[in-house]
């Protein structure tokens, strides 16, 4: 008898995973899982873009592009001035129960005014708000962030860490309000490929995996509370998006 994730692993094809090429597993029924390719390798027609300071739908500087069949994030048209123009590219449909997988690597240097923390830093945003609901100058969608990081050559820097813009969650029996929590992943230096998977089961359990190993788990993702409450509205699902934080990926 296979566990849910063991069964999933038997049907993963590495050939489906290109630079930031998303694969989504929908449904948790007992039958054989089936993968759905989110990025078609040709264009961005199934995706919506929101960059800080620009209206939804405007791909400033051709930030998000398709290169040789891969989804690429680049800032070569920014004139070396990022100006905190954080961006996100959203898949057209929301999801609740799924396993999403990507392989990523970093391909260049960030603009000179990029934040230090954003060096070799990207992320998958899950259970997020829609791009249409974001304000013009909003940095990040309310969501759960699965960080995609690369080592900087200075100490340890795990990947698949958990950050929570506009959200909180439960871990080890208590509500966590700390913005970012480090995973147990090792550091990946250089421009090597790294595989990250996220298993999301609605508003219950979420787990991050790096190269097949579980590195962090938590539950009950929820919006930040209001009116003095301790808990917020549970997130049963939402948008999936990929960041642009100044690191070419």
Q: Where do the PLM segments sit?
A:
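Bacterial N-terminal signal peptides that target proteins for export
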Residues: 3-16
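Bacterial N-terminal signal peptides
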Residues: 15-26
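Carbohydrate-interacting regions of secretory-pathway proteins
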Residues: 28-249
């Amino acid at each position: 008898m296979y566990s849910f994730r063991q069964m999933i692993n038997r049907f993963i094809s590495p050939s489906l995973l290109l630079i930031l090429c998303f694969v989504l597993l929908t449904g948790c029924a007992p039958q054989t899982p089936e993968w759905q390719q989110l990025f078609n390798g040709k264009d961005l027609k199934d995706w919506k873009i929101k960059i800080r300071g620009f209206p939804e739908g405007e791909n400033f500087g051709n930030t998000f592009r398709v290169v040789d069949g891969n989804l690429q994030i680049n800032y070569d048209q920014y004139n070396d001035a990022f100006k905190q123009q954080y961006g996100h590219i959203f898949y057209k449909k929301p999801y609740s129960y799924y396993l999403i997988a990507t392989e990523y690597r970093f391909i260049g240097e960030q603009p000179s005014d990029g934040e230090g923390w954003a060096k070799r830093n990207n992320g998958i945003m899950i259970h997020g708000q829609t791009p249409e609901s974001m304000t013009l100058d909003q940095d990040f969608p309310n969501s759960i962030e699965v960080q995609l990081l690369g080592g900087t050559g200075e100490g340890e820097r795990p990947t698949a860490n958990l950050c929570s813009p506009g959200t909180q969650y439960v871990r080890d029996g208590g509500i966590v309000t700390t913005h970012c929590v480090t995973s147990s992943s090792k550091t990946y230096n250089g421009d090597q490929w790294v595989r990250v998977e996220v298993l999301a089961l609605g508003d219950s359990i979420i787990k991050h995996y790096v190269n097949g190993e579980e590195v962090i788990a938590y539950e009950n993702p929820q919006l930040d509370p209001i009116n003095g409450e301790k808990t917020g509205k549970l997130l049963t699902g939402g948008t999936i998006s990929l960041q642009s934080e100044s690191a070419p990926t």
